[in-house]
Amino acid sequence: MPKVKTKSGAKKRFKLTGSGKIKRKSAYHSHILTKKSTKRKRNLVHAHLVSAADESNVRAMLKI
């Protein structure tokens, strides 16, 4: 039986925390930043957790 392969796009975008939650990077912080306020850009810098609704889909992509 072959090895189970992880989706490589998901592998690059998500990390597991020590408690088993899934971390993700915020979108909207790569370009077209001049119209966004400093506060908004600052809040986009921090990592966030994947929501409970999406967590099962992400776990399936990561095969965990």
Curated annotation (Swiss-Prot):
Q: Which domain of life is it from?
A: Bacteria
Q: Which Pfam families match?
A: Ribosomal_L35p
Q: One GO MF term, please? A: structural constituent of ribosome
GO CC terms: cytosolic large ribosomal subunit
| InterPro entries (UniProt xref) | Ribosomal_bL35 (IPR001706), Ribosomal_bL35-like (IPR021137), Ribosomal_bL35_CS (IPR018265), Ribosomal_bL35_sf (IPR037229)
One of the protein's GO biological processes? translation
- Ranges for the region named Disordered are 1-28
Keywords, A to Z, come to: Ribonucleoprotein, Ribosomal protein
Cross-referenced PROSITE patterns: RIBOSOMAL_L35
UniProt record similarity statement: Belongs to the bacterial ribosomal protein bL35 family.
Its protein name is Large ribosomal subunit protein bL35
Q: Which organism is it from?
A: Cytophaga hutchinsonii (strain ATCC 33406 / DSM 1761 / CIP 103989 / NBRC 15051 / NCIMB 9469 / D465)
Task: Provide the organism lineage as a comma list.
Answer: Bacteria, Pseudomonadati, Bacteroidota, Cytophagia, Cytophagales
